[in-house]
Curated annotation (Swiss-Prot):
It comes from Equus caballus (Horse). Keywords: Cytoplasm, Disulfide bond, Endoplasmic reticulum, Fatty acid biosynthesis, Fatty acid metabolism, Glycoprotein, Golgi apparatus, Isomerase, Lipid biosynthesis, Lipid metabolism, Mast cell degranulation, Membrane, Nucleus, Prostaglandin biosynthesis, Prostaglandin metabolism, Pyrrolidone carboxylic acid, Secreted, Signal, Transport. One of its GO terms (biological process) is prostaglandin biosynthetic process. One of its GO terms (cellular component) is extracellular space. Belongs to the calycin superfamily. Lipocalin family. Disulfide bonds join C89-C189. It comes from the Eukaryota. This is Prostaglandin-H2 D-isomerase.
Length: 194
């Protein structure tokens, strides 16, 4: 009896360690030698993947938006996004503050009050950037952590290879094919805002 109990406890501990190890591996690494000055400027939000219920409900009506990244005095960013909402252009600005090594930032969600960590996982600065956003769960979200992968591109029509790179990245973060969306282009709200 003691031997089977010990074996059972050993399997449980291995399972727990396996889960912890899997969660740790799920956090993507940062862009090596991230160069903030090259990341500045205009980007198009071309692809998204998320586990949030809001995203699942709205993903069919989302369209591409523009985001302008500008530096702040503390080494962070002002991220100003302009998007189409209910047939009107809406602009929102988030203050991304440094939150660790270069390429890691955080902001507080104006809607939920949660702190989100944003990581620039990969970028070539001239064509695309892959970002990963994570926020610890709160009771208001049903106990589920918020996760999102984002594809930024410098042009409205990213190359198929860039889209494939984003799909592979999103799947590596645990998103399923149906959670990955490439946002359709629109001619509305695409003018440059600073």
């Amino acid at each position: 009896m003691a031997a089977s109990h010990t074996l059972w406890m050993g399997l449980v501990l291995l399972g727990v360690l396996g889960v912890l190890q899997t969660r740790a591996q799920a956090q993507p690494s940062l862009q090596p030698n991230f160069q903030q000055d090259k990341f500045l400027g205009r980007w198009f939000t071309s692809g998204l993947a998320s586990n949030s219920s809001w995203f699942r409900e709205k993903k069919k009506v989302l369209s591409m938006c523009t985001s302008v990244v500008a530096p702040t005095a503390d080494g962070g960013f002002n991220l100003t996004s302009t998007f189409l909402r209910k047939d009107q252009c809406e602009t929102r600005t988030l203050l991304l503050q440094p939150a660790g090594p270069p390429g890691c930032y955080s902001y507080t969600s104006p809607h939920w009050g949660m702190v989100h960590e944003v990581s620039v996982v990969e970028t070539d600065y001239e064509e695309y950037a892959l970002l990963y956003t994570h926020a610890e769960s709160t009771k208001g979200l049903g106990g589920q952590d918020f996760r999102m992968a984002t594809l930024y591109s410098r042009v409205q029509s990213p190359r198929p290879e860039v889209k494939e790179k984003f799909s592979t990245f999103a799947k590596a973060q645990g998103f399923t094919e149906d959670a990955i969306v490439f946002l359709p282009q629109t001619d509305k709200c695409m003018e440059e805002h600073n």
